[in-house]
Amino acid sequence: MKSVTRPAPARNRAVRKTLLAGLIVASCATAAHRQLDERFGRANPKRFDFRRESPDAPASPTLLSTTSSSAAPAPSFRQDVLPLFEHRCVVCHGCYDAPCQLKLGSWDGVARGASKQKVYDGERLLEVRPTRLFEDAEQPSAWRKLDFFPVLNERTPGPANDRLGSLLYRMLDLKRRHPLVQQGVLPGATFDFGIDRKQTCPDLTEIGSFEAEHPDWGMPFGFPGIDATEQELIARWLERGAPHEDLPPLGASVELQIHAWEDFLGGTSLREQLVSRYLYEHLFLATIYFEDDPIRTRFRLVRSSTPPGQPIRIIATRRPIDAPGVRRVYYRLARVRETIVEKTDMPYALGPARLARLREIFFSAPDGVVALPSYDVDVASNPFVAFASLPARARYRFMLDEAQLTMMGFIKGPVCRGQVALNVIEDQFWVFFADPEADPRGLQDGFLRSEATDLRLPAGWGSDAPILVPWLEYRRLQDRYLLAKSQFLEQNLARKKVDFSLIWDGDGSNPNAALTVFRHFNSATVVKGLVGPEPKTVWVLTYSEFERIHYLLVAGFDVFGNIGHQLNTRLYMDFLRMQAEFNFLQFLPIKDRRPLRDLWYRGAPDEVKEHVYGHAAHFDRETDINYQTGHPKSEFLDGLARRLAPIVDQTYDLAAVLGRDADTLGDATLLTDLQSLARLRGASLGYLPETAILRIDLARGSPLYLTLVRNSGHSNVSSIFKEESRILPAEHTLSVVPGFIGAYTNALYIVPRSLVRRFTTAVAGLASESDYAELASEFAIRRTNPNFWRYADTLQAAHAASTGGFHGLLDLSRYENR
């Protein structure tokens, strides 16, 4: 029989093509590495490995890392190089979302290098290995095994190699050779500054082609280059092998306080161990300092496998709630080794009063801890199970004491980045809290124990979660919980007045009782005080919502998790927002609750509305507040503001600030002019960036810095998709806030005092992008301004001064190009 040759199936041809392409890529990569070996010598991933006894101890670089034939003294990393990095590099490369994971706020970050893997990837199907600086690897050679590539020269040392073999130098030199234009906007076809843009992260084998294809993409990306003196400083430092010095030693007083706090956190009784675990899971993101330390050395609370007195050995787990893998956990204070940036700065002061307060909260009641909870994911992810042995009132009191910090965990933590993560909240709202003594909601331990199963959180599914199944389960659980909660309220508020007394007043002295949250589209801010115009929505948080927000978005969230984990986290937050709004509606007359709910949720399905107030979440008791007007929401907020007036923070109150500022006291019309700006409403505000710094140059004295926060109107925020279809331009408002709001500066306007009214008129008249371009041409400092860095340095200095010098750097990576 004659044989017949049959064509290969299409799948086989595709496989062969894929294999062939892979072989070509591999051979090209091999050739590129061979060329590098010939030019710079063989790679030595251990060149910059160092010796450090513990994460909070000084590092001693190996001799090889500083080897150079040059006899000239090397610049000091801490005194010369790091300050330059901070004001030119860290302003874009300092946060979780630093491009290419290149964090330049420490020598460790520089030595770690860059990665092609994105931290934020809302489409990943499987979890990825965490890559947290100072935590998931230590030595540069260990980071190479995690697919990080060097930006320093890890090949044969020498002045020429240490410059030209360094990606850091090559990117800076690319900008020197191809500077930006010095006016107007940068071409959108060449420059994409969106946070979800495709990242291009060339390694040393690719830098040549990158330079040829993208000559305008030198560093700092999209900004003017550093000057010749600064460039020479970096070059000399690199030529000397990129050396670095130890951190300055801690003072004796700080060492003593570290010992005292680690002793407190290292208690051996079951209750002491459980309290320490609870504190750690709430403070692991905080930037801790001692209140009497004049330089505010920052620390982080970490889990260590070693006790106090021994070098810290950090227990690196995906989440702080995960099993530590050791028999005994020690909670230690590890020194922060990198530049503090505003996005992640969550200050928490330690001192004698704090220690006494924690003892009072957690140790004054009888000891009810008979066994330690496990770290099984179903237990550890549910604080109502894990910490059931600690009184709910104690846990709530701890969170209330620093309520802004607790909210910061959500606002400043890894979860708070990008539109999808943030379109679960309105652009501006006020937050109040149920009084821990007067309001029984969420504070009866028996009720919480009985409902603990229904209060499960998405972290219980781990970081590789299915997409749909968990949400369906949580919706069912929340329906059951809302029914039980409604019945509980009917029974337990029957003999209490539903009035202002149920709202926490800060115990007469704590300004954390009233907070304002701003959403800036893809980032957010929380501050003390009632800031901005009256918001559309208001939250009243009980312990149950407050604790779940933390364990949903902070302690239980894994930024390296898959799409299922991230999506379920976002969807669950809808429940918590609606429950906080439900708590507020209870204070209004029954006849006004549904109409206000419907205003908040215009266009949302009826099923969603019923979860805010209706058959799913109901409270049929009439309020005991005697309303006198037809606007009960406004009347309630005015009355509550008067009640809280002794403790409401005035830092961001425009009238209060101008009234005590010596440079503005003589200007009788400035407040009126700024209030006119703040009263603007409507579509014209949609052309402003999310946040902009307004610098008013006064006739005398220092400039006045304010933040313009655009609050976008929405028909509702109940859906994760198609937010643009729910934007209501006619309902845009503007908050004009003294000082600085937000971690990301989108624009800087410089307006002479005499032109404030003209600026207001220009903003009110915005009707197109060309209108905004005219405004920007007159008042904005654009990316292309040749003096951009001088203005930026002045801005950072003013921000530092506003916080007493203890601040995080403002991030410029989202600065506009318009």
Residue ranges and their predicted role:
Residues V4-L19:
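Bacterial N-terminal signal peptides that target proteins for export
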Residues G22-T30:
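Hydrophobic h-region of N-terminal signal peptides that target proteins for export
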Residues T30-R818:
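Aromatic- and Gly/Pro-enriched helix-to-coil junctions and flexible linker segments
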